[in-house]
Amino acid sequence: MTTAAATPSAALPIRPLAPGDLEAVVAIDAALGRRSRRAYIERRLAAALREPRLHAQFCATDGDALAGYVLARVLEGEFGRSAPALRLELVGVRPERQQHGVGRALLDALAAWGQRHGANELRTSAAWNDHALLAWFDAMGFRLAAGLIVDRAVGDDADDERREDPQDAPGDTHGEVDYGLQADNTAALLARDRADVRTMSRADLADIVRVDRRVTGRDRSAYIDHKLAEAMDDAAIRVSLTARLDGQVVGFLMARADLGDYGRIDPVAVLDTIAVDPAWGHRGVGAALFSQLGINLRALRIERIETIVAPQDFGLLGFLYARGFAPSQRLAFVRGG
């Protein structure tokens, strides 16, 4: 999408995307010079049909043709979030209709939908050196968000040999961090051997809700249910995990990996939540989950994992930095709020 000031033209009708719009969306996406993301777009449209309350997808029409589209998903509870927001997933305007205010009209429609549904913020991210996209975000009213994006490479030995400082870090971590790993770099291996870490399934819902309630002190059943559905149905690759000790679920890690989020053309794993039952803390459960996640991601040839953290959440940042995370080359942006 080019970035010069848009010249408004006659307002185009805007309506919700429908299943029959798939081919048009794929064609516009391809016309913008991107690698084919047909499967990703198809999953996003299907997800909106399954759970319309969690998705907002609109298009601008030019006669019988689509002039542009925008897709977003509701964010509900990632790392303690209390107020809902919208995650901008995909936006595109047909090249010959750019510079005519179509993108702005689509974002305005998205923002209006969010306000009606209690989601007053529109969130997204971009690489700091994607100057064209950053200029467009600026023109559309986005500003830098407070969240800090951190990421790390999924290296050959990072998960098995990463050392972690054993002391507790300060700050509000929402209880979603286990600081129990010993400084000895064999602890991750031992924890993974002791804990039964396996791919998350729908049958785990009640156990995950139980652990989450013990960690956060809140009932986030709806959020957990929706995240589990996203992990099972919406992502191209299932990477969420549970950890069991003595036959019961004592921790979980929710992550997703897909091709297309935020306009990226390479798959990246995104960590949404990690939690360990406080009764099973200081036993390396968090380390075991991360260790297995790294092994799985390497097998899938996914090279990076990222998450977003409140800058004042020093406890969570300390835990992630100890696992090899560092500030990302991507910046978080927000509109509204």
Which sequence ranges carry the predicted segments?
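A short beta-loop-alpha structural element at the N-terminal edge
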Residues: 12-25, 194-208
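Conserved GNAT acetyl-CoA-binding A-motif
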Residues: 114-126, 297-309
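Acyltransferase donor/substrate-recognition loop-hinge adjacent to the catalytic core
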Residues: 2-6, 154-202
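Conserved beta-strand-loop-alpha-helix junction that forms the acyl-donor binding cleft
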Residues: 124-133, 307-317, 334
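Acetyl-CoA-dependent GNAT
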Residues: 16-20, 27-83, 89, 202-203, ...
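Residue-level recognition of the GNAT/N-acetyltransferase active site
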Residues: 89, 94, 98, 127, ...
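Conserved acetyl-CoA-binding loop of GNAT-fold acetyltransferases
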Residues: 138-147, 217, 321-330
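Conserved acetyl-CoA-binding loop-helix of GNAT-fold acetyltransferases
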Residues: 93, 99-112, 276, 282-295, ...
